Amino acid sequence: KLWYNINIMKNFKTFLSEAEGKGLTMFDVDETMFITKAKVKVVKDGKVIKKLDNQEFNTYKKKAGEEYDFGEFKNAEVFNRTSTPIARMINKVKAILKNAVRAGSKVIIVTARPNFDNKKLFLDTFRNQGIDIDKIYVERAGNLGGGPAADNKKVIFRKYLDQKIYKRIRLFDDARSNLKAFLSLQKDYPGVSFEAFLAKPNGSVSRVR
C-alpha cells in the first residue's frame, strides 16, 4: 500500500513538472555577467571613425559606407584578461544552471559578439568563475551580420521558441533594446510565458514588461 502511494506521488510530481513544461533561461555576457573592455571599431573609407563599447554597439545603426571591425570583440585573450566578473549575476547563473539541469530545462548564453579567435580561452573565463560552461551553449549573434545587436539576438530567440519545447523563457540582459526585441515576440507565441530582466552593473535585476 505504501509503495503504491509513493508511486502515485511520484507520478503526480512528474505530471506537475510536465504540465509546467521545460524552461529556457538566456544570459547576455557583456555588462551582464562581466564588465568588459573590448570595443567595436566603425570603419569608413579605410579609417576608424568611431570606437563603440558594448552598450553603444547595442543601439548603433550603421550608416552608408560604414563597416564594423570586430578585432577586439573576437579577441579571447583580451576578454579573458580584462573582464571583471559581476559576482551577484555569476552566482545567479550558477544557481539557475544547477536547478535547470536537474529539472530538464536549459540555460544558454546569447552574446552580441561573433566567434572568438580562441574558443578554449574564452570558455576558460567562465570556468575560472566556477560556471559549468560545458552545460551552456553560447549563441554568438555577431555571426548573423552587421545589423543591430537586438535584431540579431531576436533571430536566435525565435530559433529556440520555434522548437516548441519551452513553456517558459526568460532573458537577463543589460540592454533595454534586447529586452524589448525579446518581449516583442510574445504575441507570436501566446502559449509561452516570457520574463525579461534588466541587469544592473551591481548584478541586481529588475523585471521589464
Where are these regions (language model features)?
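Short, positively charged and aromatic/hydrophobic N-terminal segments
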Residues: K1-N5, E18
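Proteolytic processing junctions in secreted/extracellular precursors
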Residues: K10-E20
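Alpha-helical substrate-recognition element adjacent to the catalytic core
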Residues: E20-G147
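Conserved Lys-Pro-Asp/Glu-containing loop-to-beta segment of HAD-superfamily phosphomonoesterases
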Residues: G23, K153-R176, F182
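A short acidic, amphipathic alpha-helical/loop segment
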Residues: K92-I96, I156, A181-L185
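Short, surface-exposed alpha-helical segments at coil->helix boundaries
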Residues: K119-L123, K154, L179
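Short, surface-exposed basic-aromatic patches at helix termini and helix-loop junctions that form
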Residues: L123-D132, R158-K164, L183-V192
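Asp-based, Mg2+/Mn2+-dependent phosphohydrolase catalytic module
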Residues: R168-R170, R176-R209
